[in-house]
Amino acid sequence: MNAVRKVSLVFVTIVISIPACSFPQMLPPPTLAPTVTLPPTNTPFPPVPPTDTPLPTDTPIPTLTPTPVDLWENFPGPSQGSATEIPRPVRTVIGSEDSVNIIVIGTDDAWWRSSMNSDLMVLVSINPNEGTVSLVSFPRDLYVYLPGRNMARINIAYAYGGRDLLALTLLYNFGVEVDYYAQVNFASFEEVVDTLGGIDVEVEQGFTDVCNRTYSYQSGRTYHMDGLTALCYVRMRRNSGGDFARHVRAQEVLLAIFRKAISLEGLTRLPELYQQYTQMVETDMGLSDMLPLVPVAAQVAQDPTRIERYTFAGMTSPWTTPGGGSVLLPDREAILALLEVALN
């Protein structure tokens, strides 16, 4: 009984004391204030250091770009650098209509030599319409451009490239178009003269020199020469005229051969002589090419004034190459003027 009374009393005490306890008053949940959205601000970049304001500059004047020029035109350019300036090709010399240009070449390719340099070069220009012939000698030491190679003496053109290179060299440097060529060496030259029974040469300038023996010639006289004598006469160099005197003598001998070949005896033997000469002379001129020129040859044989002879005396200047070679520089304009007369 007492135990029940104690429990009841405790329970009553708790109930009475609950209101007297200071528990916090329950508040309503707070109302959240609206969120304020701030406008975005630009993110500042790092400061840029100040720079100098450039001063105005002048606008450059445009330069003209030169149009590339083919220095060699239709000719082959040099195969290597040149120690000297290579001249431009000259204009082509326009000869008379139907004229025929033959380059006659004397080479020093004897058996004891290894070269085939041209010792003599004579251009024979035949004008059938006028019945005239011009002989033009080219000095072997002319310093010219060999198309496709370099600057060199003209006398090596045939040795390096045969007829084609020599013809191209004459066209490039002197404007001469070559139709045919005839090449003879020293031994064959003697045979040509001996086959004709020797030739009669009219000597313009007398001199004395030694070849296989001592020769003495007087001006204005005619001398009968066999092959060896004629060869020595052409090649002698010790007289006062120098190389240009050799050109004159070569022309004298060519005319003597021509006169003998075109004589009555020569004409009757023409087919025979042609067959013999093809064994001695290298040429691209056939018998059918020669026959149309026989009437002109007959006219010239009867009238020697129809033959004109030219050299380049006074139209060259001596010069020493960087390698020490002695050559002749051509006065191209003077030579062109001469050729325009000779080929017309």
Predicted regions located by residue number:
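Non-catalytic, solvent-exposed segments at the cell envelope interface
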Residues: 22-344
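Bacterial N-terminal signal peptides that target proteins for export
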Residues: 2-8
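C-terminal motif of bacterial Sec signal peptides marking the signal peptidase cleavage site
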Residues: 18-20
